[in-house]
Amino acid sequence: MTDWSRRRFLQTGAALGIAGTLPQTTTEVSAASPTLEKFVQPLPIPSVREPDGQRDGADAYEIAVTEFTQQLHPDLPETTVWGFDGSYPGPTIEADAGSPVHVRFDNSGLPSEHLFPVDDRLGGTTAENHPGYDGPVPEVRTVTHFHGLELDPANDGQSDMWTSPGGVEGPRFDSAWQELPMEQGRTTSTYHDHTLGITRLNAYAGLLGLYSITTDAERELGLPSGDYDIPLLLQDKEFNDDGSLHYPEEFVSAFLGDTAVVNGAVWPYVEVEPRRYRFRILNGANHRSFDLQLESESGSGVPTMYQFAPGHGFLESVVPIGPNGDLDSLLLTPFERGELVVDFSDHAGETLTLANGADMGPELTDLVEFRVSDPSTPPEDASADPTSLSLPTPASYDESDARVTREMTLGTEVRNGLITHTLNGHVFGDEDAPVYPQLGATEIWELQNESGGRHPIHLHLVTFRVIGRGPDGTQPPDPNELGPKDTVRVDPGERVRILVTFEGYTGQFPWHCHMLEHEDNKMMIPFVVENPVADYANEENVVDATGLTDAVGDWRNETLETEVLLEVIDQWRSGDEVA
């Protein structure tokens, strides 16, 4: 066992310790799903969505959000789900970097009654949970967030920007169209529901899909493509005997299903050739972490998984994962991603399983079966050897660039019989946004987890670099964390340090735990990005001579940083409106 593996084992064990400490009402206890035979249906691949046309020079998509039935296993009756364009998961949206996309999600086809019971004890389910809003809060509401996209607030799909099938609009709803500039590096991620108080229900019902942004640098790597580029969207669910999805009637803080669902199919198999494949793996579960490794049916050796990206950009170097790798397994908390190349060349005729070693709740060890063909002639494979990939150099970063270091202590307390999450001793959401980063500023956030369970922390708007973890935050990140990320695992008793630059847009953005039950139970709070240059703009939002004089005066009085003064000067010289 490598040093990384020992640390991973201890982290996993600590994260699971919460099960023995929480009140009985916080975990899901139910009758098991019907017994279903594994690996009797092929893995479905989500279709790639073609644009419906153009809108203001952007590819335009009009996507219906509806309720329908879908066969998730041959031995189950059809299951009622929600989805995008009549499919669960939704179709994949692909874009080139710099090519804008506009999307309109139309939920008018959803029923007025939710697929699952809505617990109105949770914030967001009644009007009193929406400050400054006294309108109706329908049971069925949706809003779609493109996880990991750099967007202005109006297009970010934030939790109080929902709409209902009957046309009721949430307090911060802005437009039916979401305008996505796609002006960022290569990305593999998900679009998913993000509605205040019912995200866990809407996502569990099926409201998520994949999107990707491709760059020329990615194409030049020679990664497996076409039929050899396979997405794996991992989830866990429970079923009733009639095929319907089971979810608890009252809120539980940790839902763990007993059945693996991958790309909308229960325990599927994949027929692969003895050659290299690319896998884009997303943990789309409500709460469950997946600790992934390959296992051989015969007990023989397994191919190494070579991770080259964590969802954004690229890692500093390719990380081999497996018995002889730098890591024994790939640990993904909810909504983390891992992008891999696996070479099946030496395993013709064998059967392999993607297995889960994270021992959480109902045992869920097997996920997907790979059946490697044994052709008489080896298949052609022009893709690059993953051991010799020359990855683009990630953007440099330096801790000394940080203007501010912020302590973010995560804890819990019990209120009204519910586990409630706290930030620096205050219940999430009981106060206004505690942080106001300046546009362009780099900060260090120290995430100290004093609660009893794991938290995958996600920041909207930005990507960040993990710079330390462990009990005091001084241990190096895992090798497959050395790249741009938008979600980071913070285990109990651990301090995780991230370096983040707030750039692109000003305004209000949420950061939250991405365990959906935690998120719905108020473990979400905004940060507000402010542009200090705006303080020196006139009524036309332009820095004039008066504003420049004021800025110089503040700098001389040592109340304005030199960096901000230089930005004010540049803004005055340009004559442009302040962003």
UniProtKB/Swiss-Prot annotation:
Its EC number is 1.10.3.2. Inhibited by 1 mM NaN(3), 10 mM thiourea, 10 mM 1,10-phenanthroline, 0.1 mM DL-dithiothreitol (DTT) and 1 mM L-cysteine. The inhibition by DTT and L-cysteine is likely caused by reduction of the oxidized substrate and not by inhibition of the enzyme. Cu cation 2 binds at H147, H192, H514. It catalyses: 4 hydroquinone + O2 = 4 benzosemiquinone + 2 H2O. Optimum pH is 6.0 for the oxidation of 2,2'-azino-di-(3-ethylbenzothiazoline)-6-sulfonic acid and 8.4 for the oxidation of syringaldazine. CDD domains: CuRO_1_BOD_CotA_like, CuRO_2_CotA_like, CuRO_3_CotA_like. This is Laccase. It comes from Haloferax volcanii (strain ATCC 29605 / DSM 3757 / JCM 8879 / NBRC 14742 / NCIMB 2012 / VKM B-1768 / DS2). The gene is lccA.
